[in-house]
Amino acid sequence: MPEPRGSSPLRVNAAFAARYGRYREREELQRLKDRYGDRHSSSDSSSESDSSDEHVEFDPQQERDFYRTLSLLKKKDPRIYQKDATFYQRTASSSDSEEEPAAEKRKKVQPMYLKDYERKVILEKGGKYVDEENSDGETSNQRLQQSSSKSYVEEQKQLKESFRAFVEDSEDEDSAEEGGSGLLQKRAKSKEEKAQEDADYIEWLKGQKEIQNPDTLKELTHLREFWNNPELDEGERFLRDYILNKRYEEEGEEEDEEEEDEEEERVPGPPVQLAVDDSSDEGELFLKKQEDFELKYNFRFEEPDSASVKTYPRSIASSVRRKDERRKEKREETRERKKREKARKQEELKQLKNLKRKEILAKLERLRQVTGNETLGFEEQDLEGDFDPARHDQLMQKCFGDEYYGAMEEEKPQFEEEEGLEDDWNWDTWAGPEQGGAWSQQEPHCEDPDFNMDADYDPSQPRKKQREAPSLGKKKRKSPFATAVGQEKPVFDPGDKTFEEYLDEYYRLDYEDIIDDLPCRFKYRTVVPCDFGLSTEEILAADDKELNRWCSLKKTCMYRSEQEELQDKRVYSQKARNVWKKQQIFKSLCPEEAEMPTEATGKPQRDRAGSSGQLVAPDGACGKRSQPESTPAEEEADPVTPTEKLAPQRRKRGKKARLLGPTVTLGGREFSRQRLQAFGLNPKRLHFRQLGRQRRKQQGPKSSH
């Protein structure tokens, strides 16, 4: 009977039907478990049904036996043709023993409820609940009674026997296998260690890793070389990847993914309502999926994630926004351009310095040729180093000093008499070869006897030497002096630079850095030499503190103008004339004063001839001694100038002058306090010391009576 036109064929989802069938079976199984309890038989049947869904796990030893057998097959070993050859060495007992713990792992751990605990108490303890603390107390009391009943020797003997029994039990291999407590037992490897060994084994077969102990894998070496051969065909390569990478486990996952994709690709329609028990976990999961599907279908036209505020990172990696780095690129370009210009400027200055050095060396060569001095003081290595002002001045003084410009021969040169030299020739009036005296400075005249009528003649060109007519007699030979005088001399050019100016220009090309196309160099300036009124010996022998009192280090290193330096030089030269003041400051340079301390120090004085214990006058010099009085005859012989006569008179007037204020007596002379303070002494201290000495002198005679 034909189908009506408006009817559509009924489609059934086979995957969904299969899953629903499995779900119904599990639901029925759970209902039976709740009614009759969990039996071993039911657990075995459930484990068998679940094992079909789980992935098959191979034993590692079986995998190694499989790889060893495959290696022998690829190698075509003769053992594969033997009838009694065994390739899988595992026994049934070992397989059963290893399957038992695996089955135990698959079993679920059953929780202990209150009913189970009460049943256990009734069966084991007769329905009596005993606290753990009381039981421990009872056992401790029993142990105490037992230990108290035995002596010390008996206890030691009992301990030794128990230890001996324990050692014998550990040495017995049979007892250890039966469950005895062995002393040393082989440590069982953990799951992580076994998994790491299997992974290393697979990596070794792939050729990606080396194993430290390859002796146990000798039979698999051929299989490893065969699989790592670069000329391996496509089929063998697929088999290698399928086995080593366990592609067979991925097939089940791919099937599940395909089923899910088919469900998503279905035409959306009203969901199929199924009767599901809400108490089951899978039923709840199914209902949740149903609600999610209805929610997505009802709100499919709304904006997704409307309840959440979206935020975006500032820098998006996948953005197509163009970065504007023109300013950065411009700065880098400017920096590179300035660097290139600086390098080019340095190269130009280097070339200019080389040209200047060649010019100076050429001038040195000319000087050697003209002066005849091959060992001139300047060499090429003097121009290679950095500029040193002291070295430069030393070389200039050595090469072009007074000895160079003002050197005169001490003795008149003597030449051997040669034949053909006329004695009556006056060489002092000789003006050089081919020179006509004052007429050479003027232009030639047509009436001159030596006027050249040739139109191509150029008078500016040097004249050729006139050849003397060959004489029939003996040939005349010139003397060395005549040869030296007859050489052509370089004409002095007032516009030419001196050698010192050439060197200054050469060293001026040195620079520290280039800033804005301008070579920056440290400028040296010529300063006025100033010794601050001290000689070299005084500066080296004096103490640092004394030098600082004479002139501070800050003042010596100060940057001053030339006028200020001249003023300081003049002031310190006048200060150095005061020998007494220099003596007071530089006491380390006057050993005589150290031997005879003054009364200001409070120490006993030594009598010195000619001084009579008096303080050295300001006019006295350091280290000078008083001269002995001259005899009347010497006084008459030496005429005395008027200034020398006035000097003693001035001293006498100074003694007769009235001293204002309190005075201090030193060495039989009176000095005012202002005078002593000008000498750098403390007048109050000297005054009180003087009073103390006077008081001691007065008390001395009284104590003697």
Swiss-Prot record:
One GO location term (cellular component): 90S preribosome
PTM sites of type Phosphoserine: 93-95, 97, 135, 140, 162, 170, 175, 279-280, 308, 630
Annotated segments matching region Disordered: 31-63, 83-111, 125-197, 248-283, 305-348, 409-494, 592-705
Comp. bias regions, Acidic residues: 168-177, 250-265, 416-426
Keywords: Phosphoprotein
Biased segments, Polar residues type: 137-151
Biased composition (Basic residues): 648-658, 684-705
Protein family: Belongs to the KRI1 family.
PANTHER family noted in UniProt: PROTEIN KRI1 HOMOLOG, ZINC FINGER, ZZ TYPE
Name this protein carries in UniProt: Protein KRI1 homolog
Organism this protein belongs to: Bos taurus (Bovine)
Taxonomic lineage: Eukaryota, Metazoa, Chordata, Craniata, Vertebrata
Primary gene name: KRI1
